[in-house]
């Protein structure tokens, strides 16, 4: 059974989790500013100033409508919204899939520079080599079954392999 802060997932635990799905759920008609306002109204721990700083660093204008932006920019906006929360748990589903290497670098820097350092961070990915340097522990799941749960150092020492090669 999965517990979040000692409780089963439910209405009360959702306020502690910041989730980035693999596919966007943001409405294309909305402006970036609408989305920032929505997240600020919805989540007590949302840091509006942090969101606007990250948006500004990418030259994304608050008045831009999502439907006018590239897929990569939309994904970055969604990541910015998720990482602008001071959550206890961040769950990121394939955050670097389908983007070019430069965008991957930006995404990883955004994650590392903006998550709550007291929080836990779970990243689901098939691109292990791109994130291996930031991992502490890994869980491998195959066909819905837990295959391995270990520290990265343990895999390297006992197996003599990188996590990606394992």
Sequence positions of predicted segments:
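Catalytic Walker B motif of ABC-type/P-loop ATPase nucleotide-binding domains
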Residues: 90-94, 99
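Conserved ABC transporter NBD signature motif
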Residues: 1-13
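Helical segment within the ABC ATPase nucleotide-binding domain
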Residues: 104-117
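A short, surface-exposed alpha-helical micro-motif characterized by mixed small hydrophobic
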Residues: 131-135
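ABC-family P-loop ATPase nucleotide-binding domains
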Residues: 19-77
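ABC ATPase "signature
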Residues: 149-150
């Amino acid at each position: 059974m999965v517990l979040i802060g000692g409780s089963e997932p439910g209405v009360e635990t959702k306020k502690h989790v910041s989730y980035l799905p693999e596919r966007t759920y943001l409405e294309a008609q909305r402006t970036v500013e609408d989305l920032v306002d929505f997240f600020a109204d919805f989540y007590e721990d949302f840091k509006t100033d942090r969101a606007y700083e990250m948006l500004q660093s990418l030259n994304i204008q608050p008045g831009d409508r999502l439907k006018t932006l590239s897929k990569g920019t939309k994904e970055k906006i969604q990541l910015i919204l998720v990482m602008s929360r001071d959550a206890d748990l961040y769950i990121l589903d394939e955050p670097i899939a389908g983007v070019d290497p430069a965008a991957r670098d930006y995404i990883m820097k955004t994650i590392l520079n903006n998550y709550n350092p007291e929080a836990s961070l779970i990243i689901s990915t098939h691109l292990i080599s791109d994130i291996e340097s930031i991992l502490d522990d890994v869980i491998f799941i195959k066909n819905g079954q837990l295959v391995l749960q270990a520290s990265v150092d343990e895999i390297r020492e006992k197996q003599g392999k990188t996590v990606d090669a394992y």
